[in-house]
Amino acid sequence: MVQQLVFSEPRPGKPPRHLADLDADGRASAVAELGLPAFRAKQLAHQYYGRLIADPRQMTDLPAGLRDAIADTMFPILLTAASEVTCDAGQTRKTLWRALDGVTVESVLMRYPHRNTVCISSQAGCGMACPFCATGQGGLSRNLSTAEILEQVRAGAAALRDDFGDRLSNVVFMGMGEPLANYARVVAAVRRIVAAPPQGFGISARSVTVSTVGLAPAIRKLADERLGVTLALSLHAPDDELRDTLVPVNNRWKIAEALDAARYYADVTGRRVSVEYALIRDVNDQPWRADLLGRRLHRALGPLVHVNLIPLNPTPGSQWDASPKPVEREFVRRVRAAGVSCTVRDTRGREISAACGQLAAEGG
């Protein structure tokens, strides 16, 4: 039986307004409401996006009285770190965040030799009900606000600077939630992530990835935003019969519709689409499915696609496990034989439940 999809948040949350919720015009209006001179808007944005400071009491170039005045009105504490765990010799760090209304989400900071990536959540929980994903099995609590999303980015960037003397280079919307089901807030967050300081964090659009299970109309809408970010389509099966079960949204938008939307995205943006495929033993790893995947992707996207094979990560209560390595290698060979680029993704954080499909926001 297909678990019910949830596209609207069961418990809508409205966190207090934060500077990060506002664009340049909104910041100007907020500053004017407080009776402050217009230049303060740019100054506050520089503190947040440029210096990564979210506590006005640390904004030493502001008058002391002003710091107190804006603490609650423009810089409420939206997320509090409830716990942190690390693995990979400290190179992977998972943070459990608690919001003001008590919901919890997780983000993961990963350091690599030539890049630093933060994997962020866009919703508390997820309504897409994928049976192999811990987040999907937990259901959806609510959407995150733009500022709650951006606070995960700011915290990751600040941790890299303060703990490692390093910079954040990549942001991936691959944490908890379906980003395109929280479309307006996610797009607003992306705009702030890629904008140069003091309007945003200044991360290259090419280094930002937005993942989706295949909300075809929203993929097309995102293409028309012309943000230039990477689209990652979580496919996980090349045939509708299996994908209807593994990715229940397929019952609304079939593979052909998702691939048509992905092709539209590639054509409009000029960006290669990433296809995510969690390899599950004896479920979706058969040679004929590798052949079918290669053929369908080559026909739909030509050279504008890359397949990331993901060894299935264990989740509580799941009866499935990862495909054996020889099966994995043969799957890669067959997809490549169809003329499609394919690699196995480096899995980080499995032992601390921080890898793909494992985030459940438990504990803390």
Curated annotation (Swiss-Prot):
Family: Belongs to the radical SAM superfamily. RlmN family.
Additional remark text: Reaction proceeds by a ping-pong mechanism involving intermediate methylation of a conserved cysteine residue.
Cofactor note text: Binds 1 [4Fe-4S] cluster. The cluster is coordinated with 3 cysteines and an exchangeable S-adenosyl-L-methionine.
A single GO molecular function term of this UniProt record: rRNA binding
Cofactor: [4Fe-4S] cluster
Predominant location: cytoplasm
Annotated disulfide bonds: 119-356
Gene field: rlmN
GO CC, alphabetical: cytoplasm
Enzyme Commission numbers on file: 2.1.1.192
Catalytic activity: adenosine(2503) in 23S rRNA + 2 reduced [2Fe-2S]-[ferredoxin] + 2 S-adenosyl-L-methionine = 2-methyladenosine(2503) in 23S rRNA + 5'-deoxyadenosine + L-methionine + 2 oxidized [2Fe-2S]-[ferredoxin] + S-adenosyl-L-homocysteine; adenosine(37) in tRNA + 2 reduced [2Fe-2S]-[ferredoxin] + 2 S-adenosyl-L-methionine = 2-methyladenosine(37) in tRNA + 5'-deoxyadenosine + L-methionine + 2 oxidized [2Fe-2S]-[ferredoxin] + S-adenosyl-L-homocysteine
InterPro entries xref list: Aldolase_TIM (IPR013785), Elp3/MiaA/NifB-like_rSAM (IPR006638), Methyltransferase_A (IPR040072), RNA_MTrfase_RlmN (IPR027492), rRNA_lsu_MTrfase_RlmN/Cfr (IPR004383), rSAM (IPR007197)
Tree of life domain: Bacteria
Entry binding sites for S-adenosyl-L-methionine: 177-178, 211, 234-236, 313
Protein's recorded name: Probable dual-specificity RNA methyltransferase RlmN
Localization terms from the record: Cytoplasm
Pfam families given in the database record: Radical_SAM
Binding positions ([4Fe-4S] cluster): 126, 130, 133
PROSITE patterns: RADICAL_SAM
GO terms classed as biological process: rRNA base methylation; tRNA methylation
Keywords: 4Fe-4S, Cytoplasm, Disulfide bond, Iron, Iron-sulfur, Metal-binding, Methyltransferase, rRNA processing, S-adenosyl-L-methionine, Transferase, tRNA processing
Function statement: Specifically methylates position 2 of adenine 2503 in 23S rRNA and position 2 of adenine 37 in tRNAs.
Domain Radical SAM core: 112-351
Catalytic residues in the record: 106, 356
